[in-house]
Amino acid sequence: MSKPPSDPPRRAPAAFIYEDEATERRDNGRQGGERRKPESFSEHIVVTPDEDDPFLNPDKDLSAVPVAAPRKRRTSFGKIAAGAFGILLSLAIGLWTDSLIRDLFTRADWLGYAALAVLAVGILAVLALVIRETSGMMRLATVQTIKAEADAAMLETRPVKARAVVARLTALLSANPETAKGRATLKATEGEVIDPPHLMALAERELLAPLDRKARALIVNASKRVSIVTAVSPRAVVDLLYVLYEAVRLIRAMAELYGSRPGTLGMFRLLRDVLAHLAVTGSIAVGDSLVQQVLGHGLASKLSARLGEGVINGLMTARIGIAAMDLCRPLAFRALKRPGIGDFIGDLTPSMSPRGNNP
């Protein structure tokens, strides 16, 4: 019976030092010459705080859109000149109207009385227009006043000012049927003792949460329409005109949702504030953060160039909607999460989301 072949002896483990030619030359140079003196490097060193470190906080939204705020109204020489020439033009129109009516009376009395009747109708229409525009401007100012009073009431120890702010907020949103449940909940807590921060948080959740959901739907729908029109339109000027149309429509819908209901002048002021905020923050242009968001979701390799432009224009429309939401919302975001630009990418490109392991 033959013996099984024995295993060959195994080599014992050993350690080897690997040095390349550059390391050998550097070591030989140091051995032959003087060694470098130890030094400390304390200049041009930037220490990143832990809360701002993206590697320690990967869930932090680094591309958050800045909060929009109304512009401060300042008196300028242009406004003074416009007011002076406006008064002069009004006087000229008044003198021309007076001369016209006098000439009509000299020709026939009934022509003069007809001109007076037409003038009275025109004056009444102008007064109604002025009242409507003034009311719209006052509603916009009321929203900003409630927001400022809410910030001040948060610092109080007694809930008196907070109750007053909640009452004004309830009156502002009383015409909206979606706030009926929230108004009933707040009315049931009138006899309870609640500190101001918790009371303002309760008012925000009960009154503004359903409106925020509707506002998000408005932004998503407007962004989708802009994305589709940009993808199929033959000219760039069509894209620009449609983006402006959707932006104005979205801002007006956002103002009406939160109880502002601005007139024509109020709409121009609100549109100017939104565009000024976007111009200052650089959000109206396709910046590095927007490109990073698009590329980070893998759209560059999955979309055509034209469809990619549509997605970018849709994200720009979403930023306009977020800025309008900040301006029209009567309370700042505290108890509820403020929407970010990344919240709308999945809605604009639902087919780009991962589907798991299914083939």
UniProtKB/Swiss-Prot annotation:
Cell membrane is among the record's keywords: yes
Gene Ontology terms: cellular component: plasma membrane
Residue segments, region Disordered: 1-48
Keyword Lipoprotein (UniProt): no
Disulfide bonds: none
Localisation: Cell inner membrane
Feature: compositional bias, Basic and acidic residues: 23-42
Membrane topology according to the record: Multi-pass membrane protein
Alphabetically ordered keywords of this record: Cell inner membrane, Cell membrane, Membrane, Transmembrane, Transmembrane helix
One Pfam family cited in the UniProt record for this chain: DUF697
Chain ranges passing through the membrane: 77-97, 111-131
HAMAP family: UPF0283 (MF_01085)
NCBIfam families, A to Z: hyp_HI0043
Family: Belongs to the UPF0283 family.
Protein name, as recorded: UPF0283 membrane protein RL2646
Organism: Rhizobium johnstonii (strain DSM 114642 / LMG 32736 / 3841)
